[in-house]
UniProtKB/Swiss-Prot annotation:
Keywords: ATP-binding, Cytoplasm, Helicase, Hydrolase, Nucleotide-binding, Nucleus. It is found in: Cytoplasm; Nucleus. One of its GO terms (biological process) is postreplication repair. This is DNA polymerase alpha-associated DNA helicase A. One of its GO terms (cellular component) is DNA helicase A complex.
Length: 683
């Protein structure tokens, strides 16, 4: 079974990689820099501020905004962990997506004018790119350019790691020794533990509900658990309690916590920080959110605290800074040779420090890809039988392709005696680039969560969290019935909460038509004046709807008149073009920069007091595109706490031939405050 599974995934990953590279290459060779920026694939108007040494052969290039153009970096869709190219603004965009380095004209001393690296840190005022130290000479030449730009490219490292993992899975000979792998390849039946089941006597968090306690007790007593956490059900709090209870039961327990993205694991890291002794918690990789609580656990930062390591690093940084001032190419070359010798010494000392930090920790937090990092796996080179981990926890498992989830299982084979998966298979699936092969799409969209419940139809290992602490009951009702078999309950503390209950809101309690008292509003945009438009500036002509934008603006201004805070409002649209147009109006023209505007993907895992959802699609053919994706809409409609405002054409949803959309729009006609706007009132 392991060979069949690996073979299926290897062919699917190969196809997905090819599609990804072709798509990215086509975009980079056909679109201008400005178009790439508009589509979130590039960042321009930046310059080099600093270069410094990083961890184990890394070089950090720190880039800031060009203040003559803007005081903030327009980040687009580029995020921590992305592979990017950094180039001077005069370099042409025309490129293949493989990380290559180009020569520029002889007046630049023949040096190369392109660097490839990984986005290590990001903020509105600085981007840090981690480069291999072999690019040091090239990187230094960028000081002489006033403008640089960044291009997002295909992350081939990710595909390489998944393929390598699948090959290793196929090579495991029978009989398989690893009990967890036996479950996952359907070579071992799952029988829940009933003989030695021990309930936890005392929970540390007094606010846990019964479903959370049941999930924790089950996970403590069984070697395979899926914690199914719908929106707002406190999945992360459940995991935090589980981790603490594992350490209480066995203080020597070693836990690896993984997730598909930096943000997914940083959320757990932030919550664990005040509850676990600092020396027991270690973060490997690139923290996406640069909170002090995350920094203090970063392997990079902790290893730099070693005095000798610190001294050598400072000496290297000093020489790098000197190189900025050297005009003579020969002198610069000599300087780099000295830096290389220092780096060799630094690398040896860093490995020793890193090994000590990993061994003293009890909880290691990293992404799924980071779980096979050389820092962790180097411990097995010294001692193949070294017991590094006991428990593996994968959070947001439904956002990861299954081959990603195998990376820690194969990298640390025969280590884990317990696997806990947490997530919600009714929210966004992993992002798949393939569009031309249904088998590949099915293979890669079917998550480990989905496949396990298919292998074990009794679902004995699935523990459902049934109380949500986010949404007003009326907002929760349709998602609960359509996606969770009506099992979701609204906690009493949130069931009836409204915008009027916010301390800043100064609405009049006696006025019934006040928007702050209504949890669910739908602006029905039927009619020719609310037709969608294809935006030619965006990839594949993404759609936008000017009439809907006008309604969104009016509703925001109405909420602001009641003093609903800007940062309590979020605007979501499935379409990039609509998001772009909304940002231009609300952020640039109205200067309401604290209102968050994003696609559905950008809001997963987030929440706001009020969400305005702009559906965009309004056409005579009743085409709905993205809106057919139930899980995408489920995410959008479960983000708000106190008010959900939908702006969209009800007739299109009811006549598009999609049962889910028809059911939703009909339910809203009965349960929402439906309004029929006249475009003349908004112009």
């Amino acid at each position: 079974m392991n060979k069949e599974l690996a073979s299926k995934f290897l062919s699917s990953i190969k196809h997905e990689r090819e599609q990804d590279i072709q798509t990215t290459s086509r975009l980079l060779t056909t679109l201008s820099i400005q178009q790439l920026v508009q589509n979130g694939l590039a960042i321009n108007n930046i310059h080099l501020e600093n270069i410094r040494s990083g961890l184990i052969g890394k070089l950090y290039m720190e880039l800031g905004p060009n203040l003559a153009v803007n005081d903030k970096i327009q980040r687009g869709d580029i995020k921590v962990g992305d592979i990017v190219l950094v180039r001077p603004a005069k370099t042409k965009v025309n490129t293949k997506t493989k990380p290559k380095v180009k020569k520029v004209s002889e007046d630049s001393n023949g040096e190369q004018a392109e660097c490839s690296g990984v986005v290590y840190k990001m903020s509105d005022t600085q981007i840090t790119i981690a480069l291999e130290e072999s690019q040091d000479v090239i990187a230094t030449t960028f000081y002489s350019y006033s403008k640089l730009y960044i291009l997002k490219t295909t992350n081939v490292v990710t595909y390489n790691r998944m393929e390598s993992t699948m090959r290793k899975l196929s090579e495991i000979s029978s009989p398989i020794q690893d009990k967890i792998i036996q479950y996952l390849v359907n070579e071992r039946p799952f029988i829940p533990n009933t003989n030695s089941f021990q309930n936890i006597k005392s929970f540390l968090n007094p606010n846990l509900n019964d479903s959370q306690k049941t999930a924790i007790n089950f996970a403590i007593n069984n070697d395979l658990t899926i914690i199914h956490g719908p929106p707002g059900t406190g999945k992360t709090f459940t995991l935090i309690e589980l981790i603490q209870q594992l350490l209480i039961k066995n203080p020597e327990e070693r836990i690896l916590i993984c997730g598909p993205s930096n943000i997914s694991v940083d959320t757990i890291l932030e919550r664990l920080t005040p509850l676990v002794p600092n020396n027991l918690l270690l973060r490997i990789g690139h923290p996406a959110r640069l909170l002090d609580s995350n920094k203090r656990h970063s392997l990079d930062i902790l290893s730099k605290k070693n005095t000798i390591v610190k001294d050598i690093s400072q000496e290297i940084d000093k020489l790098i800074q000197e190189n900025k001032k050297l005009k003579n190419y020969k002198q610069r070359k000599e300087n780099w040779n000295e830096i290389k010798l220092l780096r060799k010494d630094l690398k040896k000392r860093e490995f020793k420090t890193i090994k000590d930090l990993i061994i003293q920790s009890r909880i290691v937090v990293t992404t799924l890809h980071g779980s096979s990092s050389r820092e962790l796996c180097s411990l097995y080179r010294d001692d193949p039988n070294f017991q590094l981990f006991d428990t593996l926890i994968i959070d947001e498992v439904s956002q990861a392709m299954e081959p990603q989830c195998w990376i820690p299982l194969i990298a640390h084979q025969n280590q884990f005696h317990k696997l806990v998966l947490a997530g919600d298979n009714k929210q966004l699936p992993p992002t798949i680039k393939t569009e031309d092969d249904k088998n590949v799409i099915h293979n890669l969209e079917t998550t480990l969560f989905d496949r396990i419940i298919k292998i074990f139809p009794k679902r004995d290992m699935v523990k459902f969290l049934n109380v949500q602490y986010r949404m007003n009951q009326k907002i929760m009702e349709f998602p609960s019935h359509s996606m969770y078999n009506g099992k979701l309950l609204a906690d009493a503390t949130v069931a009836n909460r409204l915008l009027i209950d916010l301390p800043t809101v100064d609405a009049t309690p006696s006025e019934d038509d006040d928007d702050t008292k209504i949890p669910l509003i739908w602006y029905d945009t039927q009619g020719d004046e609310f037709q969608e438009t294809a935006d030619e500036a965006t990839i594949l002509g993404s759609k936008y709807n000017e009439g809907e934008i006008a309604i969104v603006k009016e509703h925001i201004e109405n909420l602001r008149s009641f003093n609903v805070p800007e940062n309590s409002i979020g605007v979501i649209s499935p379409y990039n073009a609509q998001v772009s147009h909304l940002k231009k109006l609300i952020h640039d023209e109205l200067k309401l920069t604290d209102i968050e505007i994003s696609t559905v993907d950008g809001f997963q895992g987030r929440e706001k007091d009020v969400i305005i959802l702009s559906l965009v699609r309004s056409n005579e053919k009743f085409e709905v595109g993205f809106l057919k994706e139930e899980r995408r809409l489920n995410v959008a409609m479960t983000r708000p706490r106190r008010q959900l405002v939908v702006v969209g054409n009800i007739e299109v949803l009811q006549r598009c031939g999609n049962k889910y959309l028809k059911s939703w729009s009909e339910w809203c006609e009965e349960n929402a405050d439906v309004r029929y706007p006249n475009i003349d009132d908004y112009l």
